[in-house]
Regions:
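Active-site donor-sugar recognition loop in glycosyltransferases
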Residues: 1-4, 26-27
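C-terminal "capping" alpha-helix adjacent to the active site of nucleotide-linked donor transferases
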Residues: 44-91
Length: 119
């Protein structure tokens, strides 16, 4: 069972907060990368997409603190470091998420459904 729509991410986007998300089963792609939302290909490395950054899904295995990070965790570190150190990239995604927020309104959703139905 998976949550169909990540409300916290949608709220962050509406507030203009740059987002990093794992490429989980539902929601993140639809919000951050609508152009590839239908792709079945899983993200294998940190990927800058239109409205944020997607990283691979972690295994969920629990490790002790001294064990090395798994590859997906290293990709998450890269994404976090990028946004922390690159103010231009951070500002770019602040602007992009603000424009994406306008599409996440009720009106935007209704218009998109009407487009789909009329096709």
């Amino acid at each position: 069972l998976y949550e169909g729509f990540p409300n916290a991410m949608a709220e962050a986007v509406c507030l203009g907060i740059p987002c990093i998300a794992t490429d989980f089963h539902a929601g993140a792609r639809e919000i951050l990368a609508p152009d590839i939302a239908d792709s079945a290909v899983q993200i294998e490395e940190m990927t800058e997409v239109e409205y944020g950054i997607l990283v691979p899904l972690c295994s969920g295995q629990k490790y002790r603190g001294k064990e090395p990070l798994e590859r997906a965790e290293q990709e998450l570190v890269k994404a976090m470091t990028l946004l922390l150190q690159d103010s231009e990239k951070r500002d770019y995604y602040k602007h992009k998420t603000s424009s994406r927020a306008k599409m996440l309104t009720i009106e935007g959703s209704v218009n998109r459904w009407l487009e789909i139905i009329s096709e």
